[in-house]
Amino acid sequence: MIAEFEHLFDQTRAAFGQERTFLRAKALAMSALVALGRHTISGMLCASAQQFVDWSAAYRLFEQQRFDRAALFAPVRRTVLERLQPHQPLVAMMDDTLIRKRGRKVYGTGWRRDPLGPHFTANFVWGQRFLQISAALPSAPTGPGQARGVPIDLVHAPSAARPRKNAPAEVWKEYRRQQQSMKISAVGAGQLAALRHRLDGEASGKDRPLIMPVDGGFTNRAVFRCAPPNTILIGRVRKDARLFSAE
């Protein structure tokens, strides 16, 4: 398993600008496989016997876009396409996920509705919101069967920061604009278009249909009106939803 993991991770070298940054990320990724408890940066450093060295370089790795996120997931996406039959479509699932945090000054954190809370009340937790796309890798080459979800994209999707009440009108106008562009549905539409663009740029995915099941938060005009070509969207809606023709 280690040899296969190294072979796969070595293909992500183009995502890092420096060799030392790539080696540091590779060590942390290997540590994530064997770390016990919560897979935090400190936990991965301890798993790789780096608890007595300076941790600042490991934390800076995840700051200021020190690696290309799209290039990091590209080898995983290509490997999934290679395992599919030529006539098979790529089935990918898109949904937002919540990562709980404790620090009040962590970028992008806020009060979010707890998806694991009871249905009879609204619980709120402090955390960060991410948008994840996972490709369905079938267990059998042909015919119906089980599939495993393999993450091929992950993007931070924070909400717009609300200004003060006495902020200038220009600040509030910019806030309203950011509210629309940073909605989870708008972010999902952008990532869906980006995935289709990356597939069209690869020989194994250029003519392959993309089937994307989404949750109810993405079953709206922001996503369906911007659906790229050769893409099928399957959205979950409420039973009392009203459907209208796009014309």
Feature-to-residue mapping (PLM):
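Conserved, well-structured functional cores that handle cations and Mg-NTP chemistry
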Residues: 1-247
